[in-house]
Amino acid sequence: AQLDRRTCTLTKGAEGLRRLVVGLGKKCILAQTLWGLCQSFQEGQERTLAFCWLYALALVLALYFDFSGYTDMALGVGKLLGFDLAENFRWPLAARTLTDFWRRWHITLGWWFRDHLYRPLVRAAGGKRTGCLLLVWLLVGLWHGAGWNFLLWGLLFGLLLAAERLGLGGWLNRFPPLGHLFVLAVLGFGAVLLTGEDLGQSLALWGGLLGQGEP
C-alpha cells in the first residue's frame, strides 16, 4: 500500500539520512567495539564474578547496538525512498519488567508471534494462556536457532514472563530500580545462551554469573 502513497520530501530525506548514520555508528563503532571486548574475554582465563557480569552485559549491549543498528539503517533507507517503516526498538534496555522489555525489543517479531501463534493457540486451548505462552516461547527460541541453547533461552523467558503474569510483574513495578536490575540480569543470562558455542559453555558461564567460577 505504501508504494502508492510514499512521499519523498527534504524533511523525510534528512531524517532518513540521520537514521542511516546513527545505525552505521551503532553497528560499526559501538557493536564492533563491544564484540571485540567479548572476544577478548573468551580468549582470556579470568572467570571472576565481576568479570563474568561485565562480559554478559557487554554481550547484551553488543546485541542491542548490532541489531538496532541494522534496524536504524533499514528505517533510514526506507525514509530516503519515501517509505515509513515500523519502529522495531523503543529503548528496550530502560524496561523495568521483561513484559515491558519484549514490547520494546524486536517489536515486529513480537507482533507476528502474538497474532499468528499465541492468540490462535489461546483460542484453541480454551483460554489457557500460561501453557500457550510457554509453548510460543519455546518456538521463539527455535526461531533463533536449532539447539539446546535456544530451547533453554526460550524456556527461561517463557517461565519468567509467566511468573510476571502471576504476580512478579506487579512487584517489579512497585520497585522500579530492582525491576530494572532484574531485567538486565535476565538479559545477561539470556545473552550468554544466545551467543554460546554450546550448552556446556553457556552453563559454565552461568556458573560464573552465580559466583561459581574461578576466584
Language-model features: where?
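Membrane-embedded transmembrane alpha-helical bundles that form the catalytic cores
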Residues: 1-214
